Amino acid sequence: MPYVTVKMLEGRTEEQKKALVEKVTDAVSETTGAPIDKIVVFIEEMTKNHYAVAGKRLSDE
């Protein structure tokens, strides 16, 4: 049973997240042969103050 975690900044619409889950599920099924009903996708949304690149939080820019 494949488990996929997608970490991204908050702000996407419910429609975007739904499409993401569907496309990730399809891609995992196509590449691994896993049945769609066995694929689990987690979305973890982060705020800009919990995400940093090159030593700087995105909220500080």
Language model region names:
Residues 2-61:
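A domain-level signal for the structural core that forms small-molecule/cofactor-binding pockets
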